[in-house]
Amino acid sequence: QGMFGCGMLQNIFSTYINRPTVFKNKEALANTFVPNKISYREEEIRHISNILAPLLRGYQASNIFIYGTCGTGKTICSRYVVAQLEEAGKNRIKCVYINTKLKRVGDTEYRLLNRLLRELDEIMPDTGLPTDILYRRLVTAVEDRGISLVLILDEIDALFKKIGDEFIYSLTRINTELNRARIVLIGITNDLSFRDRLDQRIKSSLG
């Protein structure tokens, strides 16, 4: 048979599938992986959980600001807790993780709001809309659903460098317009001095 003939009797990937691998679970290497259990961070997990727990009863929870050196488990602990929270809250809690350092995600206020609305299954037009309209759509989306939205903003210092602090302040102020819904922010940074450089109104809103 020729190179593209029909003489093959088995799937060309069968060798790959049956070949031994050194990985027990290769998915664990992915940035999006959240383990079923985290060791040696029980106190931190308990602290985050206690802050977010009121959402399960429909109450407002405080925003959270987490900072520490790289590799200390800030992101994985936060994602672990909110995954558990989302599971416990069933359809009443929606958790969204955004690494704001990534290009075309956290480099403009519009793209961040667009991403949030898409996570809520909102149909977004291809053409741009004014950010004030996107804020109104976000308020309507969470209020109509009656959900608590937990938003993790990783590398939040990169977000401030790109678009300033008005986005965070505006998000925290949305709660004043909500009755059935809640929005909680979790900001994460490796920059230990970042919080000291924030405007006082942002400090108080982030907790």
Could you describe each region identified by the protein language model?
Residues N63, C95-Y97, G207:
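Conserved beta-strand scaffold positions in the cores of enzyme catalytic domains, especially
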Residues F65-T69, I98-K101, D157:
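Short glycine-rich or small-residue beta-strand-to-loop segments that form or flank ligand, phosphate
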